[in-house]
Amino acid sequence: MTASSDRPTPGGPAAVARHAPVLYTLRSKAPMRISFAGGGTDVAPFPEQRGGAVLNCTIDKYAYATARVFDDGRGELLVTSVDYDTSAHYSLTADLSYNGELDLVKAAIKVLRPYAHDRLASKRSIGLFLHSDAPPGTGLGSSSALCVALVGAFAHYLNQPWTPYEIAELAFRIEREELGIRGGRQDQYAATFGGFNFMEFGPDRTVVAPLKIPREILNELSYRLLLCYTGTTRYSGGIIERQQAGVRAGRSESLQALEETKAIAVAMKNELLRGNVDELGRLLDEGWQLKKRFAEGITTPQIDAFYAKAREAGAIGGKLLGAGGGGHLLLFCDYERRAEVIRAVHALGGEAIDFAFEFEGLQTWNVRPPGPGGPTSTTPSARARGPDSGGRGGSSGTSRA
């Protein structure tokens, strides 16, 4: 197989890489997220027409990218994906075609190649190892987290001082524009910034506002929330396409549900800041009832059964995470009934997933100290740089990266 091939090769990266000297190794990780309210209002064309708002937070489930740089004179990208159980190697300068195999990596190469002239001239190869704590299609934004981790690793390798807004927009561009994967903007921004955020989406700007929630409120919220895997994954593209079609057609039910969902995101943010944790269950349930009106296919009989049994067992409210059709349910419980809800979920074949809130976003670091011409330091935390660092959004509302 030629170096420019984009066909996966069993053992390809390991076979090529192990004979070349490793100059240095760097790693990145980006967190996944749970969305409390407003999901769907970040999906075009709704935010461009009416403005969107989302309340979400990141959790301790991550997507990882490890890059080893080889001085081999080949100029290749050697990829191993644990999630897809596949390996391949590509030329960093050749044209690449999309065929359903590691397309996210190929799109990242295409979009980021203009920033890599000096590195490409060196003819060094990169061994890329990718894995995630949750598979795609489970509603946690894992694909976008992986894309952000990829952008972060390449930014570190290229010594690019991109702001969090620019990194999030590059990840959005790779997924939504280059690959045409349907979806909104919240996932890329959540994975980049990390923490509890209230996000506002408009036609030409995104603003990320970190929420300062007291520790005791976070502890109570953590205790009363349950993350439950339903045992099914889903392809969300068709659901999102139907939602987009409803907005473009001006379908009143879709538009009204999205407007009310946006209002719930604002209300939930305010209740959290006031410390009114008890209100979250009711608002989650209201949001879930509205979400089912966005488009056909958001819920299924199995999901409805899960939710009904959880409510019977003591859940006050909850919602399906992601676009719909499968994945994870987020449930809010009375503290006395938490164990009963977990038993009800297990009885239906589901699984309660342990999680904790994560307050850092994208992180990159050196594993092995770089030699001359390598990255000089770790990438600063997105949260440390704040929400007004440039790119698409911030107080200036500057153009997209």
Range-by-range predicted roles:
Residues 90-92, 138-142:
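Short, conserved acidic/polar surface loops in the N-terminal third of protein domains
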Residues 140-160, 164:
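DPxDG-like acidic metal-binding loop motif
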Residues 1-37, 42-48, 54-122, 169-182, ...:
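C-terminal nucleotide
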